[in-house]
Amino acid sequence: MKKNSITSSSISKTANLKAEIINISDEATIGENVKISAKEIYISRGCKVEEGTNISATGTIFLGDFTLIGANSIIQVNNLTLMDYSKLQRNMFMNGGNDCFIGYNSWIGSNCILNVAESLYIGNGVGIGTYSSVWTHGHHGELLEGCKIHKVSPVRIENDVWILGCYNVISPGVVVGEKALVMTGSIVTKDVPPMTAVGGNPAKSIPSLAPYEEVTVEDKLVKMTSFIQEFCELFTSSKKLSGEKSSWLIESEYGSHTIVIVDSTEELESLEYSIAIVKKGLREEKEYKGSVFDLSSKYYYKTSSKIEIKFIQFLLYEKARFMPINGHTRKYER
């Protein structure tokens, strides 16, 4: 990326950006009275930083495609990474001077506190309800006078965790496992195993509540077919095509688009499509004609077409979440 590439016409004249390297997509939006300062700033396509927000980093700020940082948020970190389609709603307060990494398709409600005195990792598809707080440090008592409560420790919130409702607290050093559920008003002081529901103060396991049930790829296919039919209804002209393959033709302001469902990517070689749903077989090293969504791996081949973006935004956040197998490659390195 070249130094200081600012081509967006959607940057407010009252916005103030300072960095050694600034690279902003011409499809990003920076609101009024926004202040962003860092060593390096990268703001991607469709990203919105709303009015009155103040972001400062000693290192790098990276905001992926169609991300959001809501109005009047305050962020003070070392490095900030926010991957595609993740959203931080208004009045976010994030401080502490360490690194914060937030993966793809995550949603964090308004008025949350994310403390980064130590590193904070939030995975893909995480949901955190409003007025919740995540703490990587807990100290105030005077050590000179013998206070024994003093902790600074990283926090990890793994993929597809749902911190439900509001007023939840995640304590320093905690790991919340993949697809865990934290009920409203919980104080989490210990690690939460994957696929476990917890609640209360302090939060304890709720064995009677299973956050997820096991599904097969065939189950996913049935659900995705229903989602596609619902998606097609958004357009004034759409129809299901006859033939051996499940396929639909839609007309949008972007043109004509075909959506197909096949068993594997090998079947796509002879087909024309804008969006394809496959049971398996998506490969990182291969190029495809259109956007391909793999139900087994939950990855997709990213083309950044307008119909792909509309489809992803339709699926988010509760229907289905996919991660790009190509495109942005930033990773959490701790």
What is each PLM-predicted segment?
Residues A19-I24, T29-V174, P202, S208-A210:
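Flexible, glycine/small-residue-enriched loop-and-beta-strand segment within the central core
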Residues G177-A180, P193-M195:
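Conserved catalytic segment of ABC-fold P-loop ATPases
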Residues G173-V175, K179, S186, F227-I228:
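Compact, basic/aliphatic-enriched, mixed alpha/beta core segments that act as assembly/interaction modules
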Residues K190:
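Short helix N-cap motif at coil->helix boundaries in the Bergerat
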Residues M1-T14, A19, D26-E27, G46, ...:
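Terminal amphipathic alpha-helical/low-complexity segments used for targeting or macromolecular assembly
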Residues E158-D160, L181-I187:
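A generic "structured core" feature
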Residues T130, T184, P194:
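Residues that flank catalytic or metal-binding motifs in active/ligand-binding sites
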Residues V198:
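Conserved active-site beta-strand element of glycosyltransferases/polysaccharide synthases
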